[in-house]
Amino acid sequence: YAEGQRRYVESLSAYARQFLERMDKPDVDEIIGISPAIAIRQKNSTKNPRSTVATQTEIYDYLRLLFARAGTTICHVCSREVKKDSPESAADEVLTRLTEGTRFFVLFPIQDDVSRAIVKTAKKAKTRTSVKELSTSAFLISLLQQGFSRLFRSGEMIELQKPEDYLFDDFDNTFVLIDRLASAADIRQRLVDSLEICFREGHAAIIETTDGKQLKFSDRFICKYDGTRYEEPEPHLFSFNSPFGACPTCQGFGNTIGIDYGLVIPNPLISLKAGAIEPFTRPTNAWAQKELVKYAASANIDMNVPFADLPDYQQNCVIYGDEGWRGLKGFFAWLETKKYKLHVRVFRAKYRGYTKCPDCDGQRLRQAARDVKIGKCSLPEIVEMSIADAFTFFETLEMDIERAQIADKLLLEIRRRLKFLVEVGLDYLTLGRLAATLSGGEAQRIQLATNLGSLLVGTLYVLDEPSIGLHPRDNSRLIKILENLRDIGNTVLVVEHDEETIRSADHIVDIGVHAGEFGGELVFAGDFKALLASENSLTAKYLRGDAEIKIPNKRRPVTKQIIEIVGAREHNLNDISVTIPLDMLVCVTGVSGSGKSTLVHDVLYAGLKKKRGEWNSPVGFFKEIKGGDLVDDVILVDQSPIGRTPRSNPVTYIKAYDAIREVFAGTNTAKTKSYNASHFSFNVPGGRCEICQGSGTVTIEMQFLADVELTCEDCRGMRFKQEILDVKYKGKNIHEVLNMTIREAILFFKDVAKLISRLKVLEAVGLGYLRLGQSATTLSGGEAQRVKLASHLAQKTANNTLFIFDEPTTGLHFDDINKLLTAFRALIDNGGSLLVIEHNMDVIKTADWVIDLGPEGGVGGGEIVATGTPEQVANVEGSFTGKYLKQMFAT
């Protein structure tokens, strides 16, 4: 990818290159036949708070065009259609709506500003009546001079020979009469001519029948019935990134900073009496709770019912106030008057957060944009739909012939992109989902769908584990997408460990045999059939069944040591209750979007942390977590980097480097020169090279060329001063030791028990190939997660600790998964409990207990489909996980 991208970028001008990602020339002799390359990574790099699924996939751009060109503006006052008329369209509507022979008058209104100007002039004058008469007279004379000699008021025609013929003081409900006609097909041209005069002189036309019925028309974009002005739909009106379209209150973000009632009432599943309103539980605010009790009695509000179960109007009364009760809003408004006190400002800050914008209700667009509809839905309403619902909406959308012709190509693009998103298994996401909240796998599949939608050909696509986050049920759809990319004329290169994807590949390149120092060789290249016959390939051994991840002979039994979540109702969780056994490996499974992360992260992890006073963010809704006191600690082991600087490395993370520094500080040379352990650290001044500050390299910015990272000239990349490098242990200096692999270091330091015990856990989790001083920035997400796992294993005891892992098999080969499961068993043997969110069937089949959520994603999920041992789940009808377990147990 680096070479394909580099060659393409080099073909651009120097000016253009400075805005593009800059690639180093890879260390390779020659690459022949390479195409321009696109890399679709497995991480979510989006930080923009405005970016959504719809904007990233370009669906939003097509929706903006669709609403601007084919949308119907509906007046938010009278709910009638707002449109701009022409004389021809108005004439056609009149002749269509009036039966033949119906007599009618063609009128235009005397503009309001004329009437207002006359009154305004009269008010300023000393003799108001005479001036008003003069102004009215002047206006009537101007009408006569233009040839308009008839007025119409209250169903009566007024012949105007001279100004004195008009007997009224104002022009309210007074119209200029242009023509009198009877509805018939042959009057169309005369009617068009009359309407042209109306639009030219008054920008509006009134058709009034002899029985008093009216038809109103205007050549301006206003509501003819209540006069409300509207913006003519243009694409930028529907952009929340444009000041023209964004809600002026929240500036297009959809939320504003204020009192977050989700923090004020953190758990609405408890009653007002039990302390649902968190600030009222403070002793200093006991008076406010008493006021609430008094108000509740007078308003007949049940204090013993969970707040969430109270009727909506009662909830609103509690929050926003009622007669005799200021409400929570009033309580915080009162606190605002006391903000000169520091403790009050600190107290209020605890309850401030981002809340839904009160003006646009979180829809991000101004009222004029929200008034435009297609198929009875506004653009924000469509964006709030799930991708599956949006796809159904546009597939069944019916429009009139004229609008259908305008929207034809736009609808084709929208439907095509929605179809691709459904096919990559993202149908449960909403179009308005913030891109920054997507998982790495979801972000990657959105990029994949976007690229497929662009229909590029002759391109090299490089994908890094696109199956991440996908349930086996959705894998076949993903493979179909990749095959479609190939079939339209692209090369698709996939880094993947998923067996089904490997079996579907046209050509397989196997690198190995093992990792690190023992890898980097081409083991095999060819098709799947030839791979199975390969003797040297570790991948082939697992595919053939020569090596396997074994199902345990017996599962750990469920004991009385359990955590029970009662009434979880966050996001799509449907008031579920679930039991999580401790002292074993528990897998939470289900299709993408079924609620796994919500249950484990937002409810269980956040709930247990909140109970310990270690959590300040919002917690998912639940009634109760029973058994939380059975665990002393809960630890989330994720795939975030273990460090963000080149000086961070695996041995510093697991505290093994302290022992290495002590070994060097204990040598005779170090003692003679009075060097202590800190002299062998590259994180603090003393022994490190101060030119590169212990990183071994210096970076030079090159503007439109790629930044150049040069080896430090002073220490020659060795990180330390020369006098520190002169200190040796068993003939090796600190730089040479840091360049050893973990396997080599175990043999080298075999006499240092304190160090060996920590290094061995890194080898136990399959990281023996890493170098001691390898920069944390070069580690993959899976490697970083296993380093964290090793640090917990190194502590020897994990008594009463609950470890939570989210897809720990990401980036792992079959052999690596085997090692990971061995480490999991060691953690449990040390007294820990493991809760793992996982799609990999090899891990799920080895679990002691499985909790399967679903049955579908999004609104179709959030239910407990099955719980039990893998064998029990395999026999549950309707469980997709059970279906694949059953297939696995049958082989």
Region locations from a protein language model:
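Conserved phosphate-binding elements of NTP-dependent enzyme cores
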Residues: 1-891
